[in-house]
Design a protein with these regions (language model features):
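Glycine-rich nucleotide cofactor-binding entry segment
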Residues: 386-434
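Conserved structured core elements
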Residues: 64, 131, 154, 311, ...
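Extended, folded cores of ATP/NTP-driven motor/assembly subunits in large transport
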Residues: 1-405
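Amphipathic, soluble alpha/beta structural segments
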Residues: 159-206, 408-409, 441-469, 475-481, ...
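Generic recognition of flexible, low-complexity loop/linker segments
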Residues: 34-35, 123-126, 250-251, 323-327, ...
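Solvent-exposed, flexible loop/coil residues
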Residues: 59-61, 381, 407, 423, ...
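Switch/coupling segment of Walker-type NTPase motor domains
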Residues: 54, 61, 86-97, 101, ...
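Glycine-rich phosphate-binding loop of nucleotide-binding enzymes
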Residues: 50-53, 60-62, 68-75, 414-495
Length: 561
């Protein structure tokens, strides 16, 4: 709504003195092992990490349902429960990326295994260029003490996870070490230094938790950039100018091949206060209308002619009031920041320019936080702390349009097989169907789309990585050359072929309650019904004859007698 375009500035400030060390820059007081973090001002926070779901490829109806569910999720938070949505894109270390589990088996196919492993490693290296994308929600509550904050945070955490479950989103709360690991990753761009921390080490070393996560240095002396260790960074905020937003804005920013953190600090406005404020705005607009009409009468022109902006503001205010009163909408104050990190200043400026281009595409503007780089950076940390005093009024629908979902990744461990690349996220698809409730699978596609190639690739992967038996039913004869190349046996079943299937063969050592003869009789009845039964199937007399003949044939084996 155009009425809400003007940004607002917080009146409440938290006194933060100039930091004298890298540790003092990190804006928290205590990190507890259970994941509760105490922030300045007797505020306590907790973080939940959540996974992606398939939104971009969903049907319009499913997307509408997800949007409605996400709107309800946002409406859960009241004015006493500010929260932070964090989207962290980090460039992972080569050793921490997905590993290929195809060991050598000391046979003549090890050279093929090596070639296949090299191919998989190449695909994994190309997938998102080594960018790990994580999503977090951090919620805060004010409390006088830890004992008061813990049960309240526990209830909120249970509600948040329940709301995620209703959306079909997998999530997990982070304990203290996991939260420290996230902070360590944000303050050590490029993951050059592994995170080493144990709660047992604190009393032994006399160090605090900040000592384990702080970088070598921070440098915030420049107005538009900063340094964290050897990396360059820039903090910006999104100025939302568009009257209607697109759900692609956030997704396109997060799809970039860049190390960045997108943060949305959201504060719910009390519903009665929001309605009262809008009514006050409508009254102000009404007075402005009266003044304009008086001017018109004095000037001698039609009093119905009003400035276009005044008419637009009046219409927008009336619509906003209607949404708040009757459409289950709430009012939020949103701080939207983007922090880019790069190894060089030139790469940093290029990344910021790219993000700015995406913002302009959707009628928004990416503004640099001049002389507020430190506040912008610490506000991007997954802590729940907001030091940027720029807010934008948004309704539930306009806030929910920043859908945090795109596509769900499939990357299983163990003897997972390679199934290609995710077309949306450009990540590898690795799955072990034997671990699923149903291990069955189908290849569906139009002619020439690569179904046979995909099946052969999976066959080779199974052959090289597992000890599974592979049986191929191949009526078109497509797989015989591959089977022979892998040392398999090809059995041709056809008229004139020396091979045949004996449907009368019987296993007499079955440990089953039913006799082998009864089971074979049932099988032969089904076979005859399929071959000669026609549309109506076998007649009762025919079934009786077949059953009796089967028993006579096997009489010499003394089965079923």
């Amino acid at each position: 709504m155009s009425l809400l375009r003007k940004t607002k500035t917080k009146s409440k400030r938290i006194d933060r003195r100039a930091a004298l060390s890298a540790q003092q820059t990190i804006p928290y007081v205590v990190m507890h092992p259970d994941g509760i973090c105490q922030l300045p001002g007797s505020v306590f926070s907790k973080t939940v990490e959540y996974e992606d779901i398939n939104y971009a490829v969903a049907s319009t109806e499913d997307q509408t349902a997800i949007f409605s569910g996400w709107s309800s999720f946002l409406n859960y938070f009241d004015c006493s429960l500010p929260f932070q949505l964090s989207f962290v894109n980090r460039r992972s270390r080569a050793t921490s990326r997905y590993k290929v589990n195809i060991p050598a088996q000391q046979d003549k196919y090890d050279s093929i295994r090596d070639e296949y492993v090299d191919m998989l490693k190449g695909q994994i290296a190309k997938s998102n260029n080594g960018i790990d994308r994580s999503k977090y929600i951090t919620f805060n509550i004010p409390a006088a003490s830890m004992s008061e904050a813990r049960p309240r945070l526990g209830r909120v955490e249970a509600d948040v996870m329940g709301n995620f479950k209703r959306l079909g989103v997998q999530c997990q709360p982070l304990d203290g070490r996991e939260r420290l690991a996230v902070l360590h990753g944000q303050m050590h761009p490029g993951q050059r230094e592994p995170f080493r921390f144990s709660w047992k080490d604190i009393p032994k070393t006399g160090m605090g938790t900040k000592d384990y996560i702080a970088p070598d240095s921070f440098d915030f002396r420049q107005s538009r950039t900063f340094r964290v260790g050897q990396a360059w960074g820039a903090a910006s905020y999104l100025q939302i100018l568009a009257s209607e937003m697109s759900d692609r804005l956030l997704a396109e920013i997060l799809e970039l091949d860049a190390e960045l953190t997108v943060t949305m600090h959201i504060q719910t406005v009390d519903q009665l206060k929001a309605i009262k404020t809008i009514k006050g705005k409508i009254s102000d607009i009404g007075r402005m209308k009266v003044e304009e009409q008086k001017k018109a009468v004095r000037s001698g022109y039609d009093m119905e002619i009003l400035p276009p902006d005044l008419i637009t503001f009046s219409k927008d205010a009336a619509e906003l009031l209607s949404e708040l009163q009757s459409r289950n909408e709430r009012m939020f104050l949103l701080t939207f920041t983007v922090v880019n990190i790069a190894p060089t200043r030139q790469r940093l400026e290029n990344d910021v320019f790219t993000v700015s281009g995406i913002a302009q595409k959707y009628n928004c503007a990416l503004k640099r936080l001049d002389w507020q780089q430190e506040q912008g950076f610490v506000s991007s940390l997954v802590l729940g702390y907001n030091g940027v005093e720029i807010q934008r009024g948004m309704t539930t629908s306009s806030t929910a349009i920043f859908i945090p979902f795109m596509t769900r990744e499939l990357r299983m461990g163990g003897q997972a097989l390679y199934y290609g690349m995710n077309a949306l996220s450009n990540n590898v698809i690795m799955a072990d169907r034997k671990k699923l409730k149903s291990a069955n699978g189908l290849y569906l596609g139009s002619t020439g789309s690569g179904k046979s190639f995909a099946a052969k690739r999976e066959l080779i992967n199974v052959f090289l990585a597992t000890q599974d038996r592979i049986i191929v039913v191949d009526p078109m004869g497509e797989y015989a050359p591959l089977i022979r190349r892998l040392g398999g046996q090809v059995i041709e079943i056809a008229p004139g072929s020396p091979h045949y299937i004996n449907p009368m063969d019987i296993a007499i050592n079955l440990n089953d309650e039913d006799s082998p003869l009864s089971m074979k009789a049932d099988f032969l009845l089904s076979l005859c019904e399929l071959v000669v039964g026609g549309k109506e199937g076998l007649q009762p007399i025919e079934r009786t004859v077949i059953d009796r003949c089967v028993r006579l044939v096997y009489r010499e084996l003394a089965l079923g007698l």
